[in-house]
UniProtKB/Swiss-Prot annotation:
Gene Ontology terms: cellular component: cytosol
Signal peptide: none
Gene: ppnP
Superkingdom classification of source: Bacteria
HAMAP family linked to this entry: Nucleos_phosphorylase_PpnP
Function text: Catalyzes the phosphorolysis of diverse nucleosides, yielding D-ribose 1-phosphate and the respective free bases. Can use uridine, adenosine, guanosine, cytidine, thymidine, inosine and xanthosine as substrates. Also catalyzes the reverse reactions.
Protein name: Pyrimidine/purine nucleoside phosphorylase
Any GO molecular function: guanosine phosphorylase activity
Enzyme Commission (EC) number: 2.4.2.1, 2.4.2.2
CDD domains in the record: cupin_PpnP-like
EC supergroup of this enzyme: transferase
């Protein structure tokens, strides 16, 4: 069962995904149906990420600004909000307050 605060009956990869000299750290969660998510934290900074698969980023805590590839506008997101990123794309993120997030690979 999945609730708003936890994921049940999953496996977690013990090894952390560490990016950008430790500014972004996450762990991969594997679901029985074969889907996966990452749960992570990004420290205040400005980064550029690339995507392979489409992603849904759900902000659990913190605040960030995001600019998707091909866009000239920044959008601000906080706790309880989410944004989608196309596959085979890039996005800029400026983390204003330490970001706690869940990333779903669609």
């Amino acid at each position: 069962m999945t609730s708003a605060t936890q994921f049940d009956n999953v496996s977690v990869v013990k090894r952390a995904n560490v990016y950008f000299d430790g500014k972004c750290v996450s762990h991969t969660v594997l679901f029985p149906d074969g889907t996966r998510k990452t749960l992570g934290v990004i420290l205040p900074c400005a980064l550029n990420f690339g995507t392979d698969a489409p992603e849904l980023m759900e902000v659990q805590a913190g605040k960030c600004r995001v600019k998707l590839a091909g866009s000239s506008e920044w959008q601000t997101y906080g706790a309880g909000e989410s944004f989608s990123v196309p596959g085979n794309s890039r996005f800029d993120i400026e983390v204003l307050d330490t970001l706690d997030y869940v990333c779903s690979y669609l």
